[in-house]
């Protein structure tokens, strides 16, 4: 009996120490079959983050429209930032999302739009929600499977959700400046951008953060824009030198693309210690004390 109690206590400590919400009630990534089977669950909120006109043309039955642009906003000179706390709370409330809701974020497709869905999902998790998922393959996967669509406008009653910010999901500039030479950084952008052959106009420097490891976000997806098997993602990350025991920081140009890696590593794989840098290259490249590196691997 004493041994059993000791083992139980050890198991609980392991779960608590993992940093992963073991109370999660839904998978971090759901497929069409799962979503169809759960459409009538009263806990479910299907959050359609496509453009309003796309939603009106047809959507998953019961889905609520909440355009992506409301979840990633311009703040001063920076693009695609987390909304101010009061705006974020109001946004969640207006979608009818409660603390115990099962939220499935739906974009137009997987592939090039996958990180739009994960950006919203990451923001919801950052806000304190536990049961959030993204639809693998997006709305395109739903229609390709021949599932029912609706044109009925859905408006849920506003909730009374209150924020419970998880600061350890976010890396800000101060955190980055303190840890740039000590923690592993994952660059989610393309090879060409990482090496400095190309860059976006609003990013002041070419290349990548000193010491950052290149892992384009597209590597987690197959030719149809759906997730590759979990084992392949773990194999890839391990081969690149990342491990579950490390604290990892992901970044890209604006904090959108890197949310895909954050979501997959933290929520899908269950690695507990990872942050997403919302300001990303757009912010850090403006700092004269940081010199980006070009045409080298690290």
Describe the residue ranges of each PLM region.
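C-terminal soluble interaction/assembly domains
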Residues: 235, 245-298
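Thiolate-centered catalytic microenvironments shared by cysteine-dependent enzyme domains
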Residues: 85-175, 257-274, 279-280
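Helix-loop module immediately N-terminal to the HCX5R catalytic loop
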Residues: 73-101, 217-248
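Bacterial N-terminal signal peptides
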Residues: 7-18
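Short N-terminal segments immediately surrounding and downstream of signal-peptide cleavage
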Residues: 24-40
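Short hydrophobic beta-strand that contains or immediately precedes a catalytic carboxylate
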Residues: 35, 45-50, 66, 185-187
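Active-site neighborhoods of enzymes that stabilize oxyanions during catalysis
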Residues: 24-26, 72, 140-210, 289-298
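Positively charged n-region of N-terminal signal peptides that target proteins for export
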Residues: 1-6
């Amino acid at each position: 009996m004493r041994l059993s109690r000791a083992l139980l206590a050890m198991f609980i400590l392991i779960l608590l120490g993992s940093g992963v919400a073991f109370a999660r009630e839904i998978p971090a990534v759901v497929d069409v079959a799962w979503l169809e089977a759960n459409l009538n669950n009263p806990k479910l909120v299907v959050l359609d983050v496509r453009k309003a006109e796309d939603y009106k043309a047809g959507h998953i039955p019961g889905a609520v429209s909440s355009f992506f642009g409301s979840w990633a906003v311009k703040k001063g000179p920076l693009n695609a930032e987390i909304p101010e706390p009061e705006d974020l709370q109001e946004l969640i409330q207006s979608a009818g999302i409660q603390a115990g809701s099962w939220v499935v974020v739906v974009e137009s497709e997987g592939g090039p739009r996958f990180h739009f869905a994960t950006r919203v999902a990451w923001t919801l998790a950052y806000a304190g929600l536990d049961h959030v998922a993204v639809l693998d393959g997006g709305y395109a996967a739903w229609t390709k499977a021949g599932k029912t669509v609706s044109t009925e406008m859905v408006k849920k009653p506003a909730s009374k959700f209150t924020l419970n910010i998880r600061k350890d999901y976010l890396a800000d500039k101060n955190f980055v400046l303190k840890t740039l030479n000590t923690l592993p950084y994952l660059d989610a952008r393309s090879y060409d951008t990482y090496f400095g052959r190309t860059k976006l106009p609003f990013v002041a420097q070419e290349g990548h953060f000193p010491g950052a490891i290149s892992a384009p976000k597209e590597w987690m997806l197959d030719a149809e824009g759906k997730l590759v098997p979990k084992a392949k993602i773990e194999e890839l990350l391990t081969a690149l030198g990342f491990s579950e025991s490390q604290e990892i920081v992901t970044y890209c140009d604006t904090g959108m693309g890197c949310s895909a890696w954050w979501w997959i590593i933290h929520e899908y794989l269950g690695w507990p210690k990872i942050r997403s840098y919302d300001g990303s290259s757009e912010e850090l490249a403006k700092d004269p004390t940081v010199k980006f590196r070009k045409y080298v691997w690290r």
